[in-house]
Amino acid sequence: MGVYFLLLFVGLCWGQYNPNTLPKRTSIVHLFEWRWQDIAQECERYLAPNGFGGVQISPPNENVIITDPQQPWWERYQPVSYKLCTRSGNETEFRDMVTRCNNVGVHIYVDAVINHMCGANAGAGDHATCGSYFNAKTEDFPAVPYSGWDFNDHKCKSKSGNIEDYHDISQVRDCRLVSLLDLALGKDYVRSRIAEYLNRLIDIGVAGFRIDAAKHMWPEDVKAILDKLKDLNARWFPAGTKPFIYQEVIDLGGEPIKGSDYFGNGRVTEFKYGAKLGTVLRKWNGEKMAYLKNWGEGWGFVPTDRALVFVDNHDNQRGHGAGGSSILTFWDSRLYKMASGFMLAHPYGFTRVMSSFRWPRYFENGKDINDWVGPPSNADGSIKPVTINEDTTCGNDWVCEHRWRQIKNMVIFRNVVDGEPFSNWWDNGSNQVAFGRGNKGFIIFNNDDWSLNISLQTGLPAGTYCDVISGQKEGDFCTAVEVHVATDGMANFLIGNEDKDPFIAIHVDAKL
């Protein structure tokens, strides 16, 4: 009896690290700036059938409408209230999305913008997505309500009121991030307003939260807010389930604030992951894939059960945030597919796949001057629907990386090999590497400038397997390269360095 209660207690304490996805659903996808009605459809027609565990959505709460530049993507990170109306849809559409996605086993993770309100220069008026009045100059947000007493101006010690020195911990947490009005999260009143908002989302059925700008909040303030949260809605989650928490903490190693400061609250975003993986696949600074043998904690990353990992995110794919020019994105599609394949095959961390929109990149002196451009929209500012082409790709400038065969099939690969150990590593000392996941899956990469032809131990049962990168198994038929595994687990692999996708992945569910 005692052991049962102990396990129950541990479960209650550690729930915030558990993604709450269904068993054997091991990844989420960020449908950046998608409309709620498109997400609901995507859950039903694509994400559920292909084993995706959940969706990170753009902030669902009311934001300021910025007209100079014209409705940039970052206006959604400038709250005016916690009402549920944005360019992605209204509260009715939001509730419909959460219900429909949950009903097919795909959960919703909300991007929670709780560190701040809108920018100090956002003016006064009702230019907000629900039409709520606000006055940024006097810090008056009656739709919450917040007033000047609810902000950190008196606590901030920098001259400008903005963060000027990232080596000064209190500045980073008490001053304004790029002039965004910094909420006084030390006040119980403010904590309660935020918790009310998050609890409303929990009641609707969301599964967890990405805590935006967590680095700019004191960990104990975040904890105080999380302590006020309800358990998840028992209609879709086991009784007593805690919301999954992952905190945006950009820690590349050069500052006093560490990702580990936030482990008590939940997982953290491991920004070193994509930055380093990009450097390796681009072969910069003498890096090579052979060095990935001890990938994960061996590279100085946070512990695997505290990490949320990704190749790129909505910030760093356009030069914001962290990682610089090493970050791989859909613009570098060949390397991007390899990076995504490596991430989804490797056991480290909980994986998030990016799904982007195209924008007109324009570089001047190494900076993309169009990095602000918002989602594909109509003349009236409404977001364009995600249309689906005959070949299953998306139209209207939606990139839909999560629908690329190579990435979707690796999401499935990760589900198949879930819980299996990292095994049978091989490398050629350069940029040809391979590894398995127990006796369930095997993957091999050729990122060298010459072809690969080798027989390796796969750890897999004997038989003929269909490569899920160059094609896939459809019924009893393989549209791709076939790999023959002998009775001793050995198989021969041939990958030309000019191949469209210079990697091969096989798993037990792709056995013919």
Give names to the regions the model predicted.
Residues 1-3:
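Positively charged n-region of N-terminal signal peptides that target proteins for export
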Residues 31-33, 84-86, 213:
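Short glycine-centered, acidic/aromatic-flanked micro-motifs in structured strand/loop junctions
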